[in-house]
Regions:
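Short structured motifs
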Residues: 18-22, 81-87, 109-111
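Residue-level preference for beta-strand/loop junctions
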Residues: 16, 30, 77-79, 93, ...
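Hydrophobic residues in beta-strands and at strand termini
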Residues: 36-38, 87, 101, 145
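Hot-dog-fold acyl-thioester-processing enzymes
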Residues: 37-62, 74-77
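Hydrophobic residues positioned within well-ordered beta-strands of beta-sheet architectures
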Residues: 34, 81-83, 97, 122-124, ...
Length: 149
């Protein structure tokens, strides 16, 4: 995948993600932003469901790595290996997410590993935001890229 249109089509093809109304909101080659409506992600308390926060953060990081690989001409299978999410406060509005590579991830070494061994791992970060851009949750995840069959 190389474009936001392709990424959005991929998200729409996954029934749980489509139900959440997640769509891309921006991509600058380094950071990916997503958004989703409160109405599709509301819980019994009238706030965003915690699982929706975890999902949009994971999908932002997954999408970022997928797009960065696509920009390198690489079609890989990307998987989340493990992740952590810290909830900072409830959200009673539409949600957003922004993902980027952790500063400790050496992109050139990642690409070298993938090209030589057919697999590589990267640490990604994301934040879940309110409509004004304030952070309501912080995500950290380790992702694996495997050579596509």
């Amino acid at each position: 995948m190389k474009t936001l249109e392709e990424l959005d089509a991929c998200y729409r093809a996954m029934p749980p993600v489509a139900a959440m109304g997640i769509e891309s909101a921006g991509w600058d080659g380094q950071r990916l932003r997503l958004r989703a409506p409160l109405a599709a992600n509301i819980n019994d308390k009238g706030t965003v469901f915690g699982g929706s926060m975890a999902s949009i953060a994971t999908l932002a990081a997954w999408g970022l790595l997928t797009l960065r690989l696509g920009a390198e001409g690489i079609k890989a299978e990307v998987y989340v290996a493990d992740s952590q999410l810290r909830y900072l406060k409830p959200l009673v509005a539409d949600l957003g997410a922004e993902a980027w590579l952790d500063e400790g991830t050496d992109w050139d070494a990642f690409l070298r590993s993938y090209r030589e061994r057919g697999r590589a791992r990267a640490q990604l970060l994301a934040r879940v935001t309110d409509p004004e851009g304030a952070t309501v949750a912080e995500f950290s995840g380790r992702f694996a890229a495997l050579r596509a069959p």
